[in-house]
Amino acid sequence: NTGFAEQNYIIPDASSCSEVLYTLLDEAKISREAAECLYTGIVHDTGVFKYNSTTRKTMEIAGALMEKGVNAAKIIDDSFYRKTYAQNQILGKALLGSTRILDGRCIFSVVSQKEMEFYGVDTNDLDGIIDQLRITEGVECAIFFYEKAFNEYKVSLRSNDYVDVSKVAA
């Protein structure tokens, strides 16, 4: 953040905007509803606490929010793991249709508009497919394409430890 506003409150190593907001609030006055919103923001921005941006402070704040009555398991399940039957079908199609290349270090999959129509899903239902591809054992780089319009594709790139996909995406 370049500090472009008149007033700036920047915590460079904060995991999320929600973590920054928490530090600005009077902890005693945070309601359960507000705590749920802050917790949801932290969970999303940290990838359920697995991204490098997650710190001890992040975990302490999450714990304090849980003490306000946040149902952490429900928020995480509803946000990341609960899928409709159609979402599971398109995920299965994407995984079954995936191809490993470069001695198995890279995996890619493509979902067409025709397949999306067949399963009755839209682009929001494709969330999580790239992450499932990425966590395949032996894979360093995952690529997921889905067709937005005839011959127009959205491409998602994810990597694990050794490949900087931001250099390709830039």
Please annotate each region the language model reported:
Residues G47-A170:
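Hydrophobic helix-and-loop "lid/oligomerization" segment in the mid-to-C-terminal part
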